[in-house]
């Protein structure tokens, strides 16, 4: 690990203290994990503390870990990951938190910290069903208004539930149940040992 990443890891531990669940450095990237209850406070500290100064939010995404890894996943299902940039210190970091409730995954909104996260949170809501308390306009952004479900969840069927088509008799687009037979898609992956140098970062 480079001295720059060591300094960042040490600063995160010292400044965030008990809020830190883990700090992992892998392949030159730092991932900071905090509890969902500490997510907003940690984000504010990452932005405002003079030794961190993560002024810019690059991206926010949802994660569904229900089919993660080689075996059955036993941890919490849903997480949110935020990618941040410190222009002051030339650092990048990934902030991750797992939702406490898999049935109703909830996080505090970061719109008050980085206003540009607004549409990213709407996207995570739309595609993963993640809720963001305090968001000023949490509604779907990519799927149709009447869309049922959240298409990036691992249990969402590949073919979906309904399909759209133009009905010339009615002169409009109509929804109907999917006409494709559902099937299980299991890709066959053959990898050599140490493929992509995984685990050696």
Curated annotation (Swiss-Prot):
GO CC term, one of those recorded: plasma membrane
Main location: membrane
Assigned keywords, A-Z: Cell inner membrane, Cell membrane, Membrane, NAD, Quinone, Translocase, Transport, Ubiquinone
GO MF assignments: NADH dehydrogenase (ubiquinone) activity; NADH:ubiquinone reductase (non-electrogenic) activity; quinone binding
EC nos: 7.1.1.-
Protein location: Cell inner membrane
Membrane topology according to the record: Peripheral membrane protein
Catalytic activity entry: a quinone + NADH + 5 H(+)(in) = a quinol + NAD(+) + 4 H(+)(out)
Top-rank taxon: Bacteria
rRNA-binding among keywords: no
Similarity annotation: Belongs to the complex I 30 kDa subunit family.
PANTHER family membership: NADH DEHYDROGENASE [UBIQUINONE] IRON-SULFUR PROTEIN 3, MITOCHONDRIAL, NADH DEHYDROGENASE UBIQUINONE IRON-SULFUR PROTEIN 3
Oligomeric and partner information: NDH-1 is composed of 14 different subunits. Subunits NuoB, C, D, E, F, and G constitute the peripheral sector of the complex.
Role according to the record: NDH-1 shuttles electrons from NADH, via FMN and iron-sulfur (Fe-S) centers, to quinones in the respiratory chain. The immediate electron acceptor for the enzyme in this species is believed to be ubiquinone. Couples the redox reaction to proton translocation (for every two electrons transferred, four hydrogen ions are translocated across the cytoplasmic membrane), and thus conserves the redox energy in a proton gradient.
Record-given protein name: NADH-quinone oxidoreductase subunit C
Species this chain originates from: Aromatoleum aromaticum (strain DSM 19018 / LMG 30748 / EbN1) (Azoarcus sp. (strain EbN1))
Species lineage: Bacteria, Pseudomonadati, Pseudomonadota, Betaproteobacteria, Rhodocyclales
Gene: nuoC
């Amino acid at each position: 690990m480079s001295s720059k990443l060591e300094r960042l890891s040490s600063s995160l531990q010292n400044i965030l203290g008990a809020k830190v669940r883990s700090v992992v450095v892998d392949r030159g990237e730092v991932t900071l994990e905090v509890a969902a209850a500490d997510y907003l406070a940690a984000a504010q500290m990452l932005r405002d503390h003079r030794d961190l100064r993560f002024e810019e939010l690059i991206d926010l995404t949802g994660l569904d870990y229900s089919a993660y890894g080689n075996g059955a996943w036993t941890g919490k299902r849903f997480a949110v990951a935020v990618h941040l940039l410190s222009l002051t210190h030339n650092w990048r970091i990934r902030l991750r938190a797992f939702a406490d409730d898999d049935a109703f995954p909830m996080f505090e909104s970061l719109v008050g910290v980085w206003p540009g996260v607004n549409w990213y949170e709407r996207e995570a809501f739309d595609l993963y069903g993640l809720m963001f308390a305090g968001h000023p306009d949490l509604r779907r952004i990519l799927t149709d208004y009447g869309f049922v479900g959240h298409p990036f969840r691992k249990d969402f069927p590949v073919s979906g539930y309904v399909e759209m088509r133009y009905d010339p008799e009615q002169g409009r687009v109509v929804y109907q149940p999917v006409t494709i037979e559902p099937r299980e898609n299991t890709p066959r992956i053959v990898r050599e040992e140490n493929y992509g140098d995984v685990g050696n970062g």
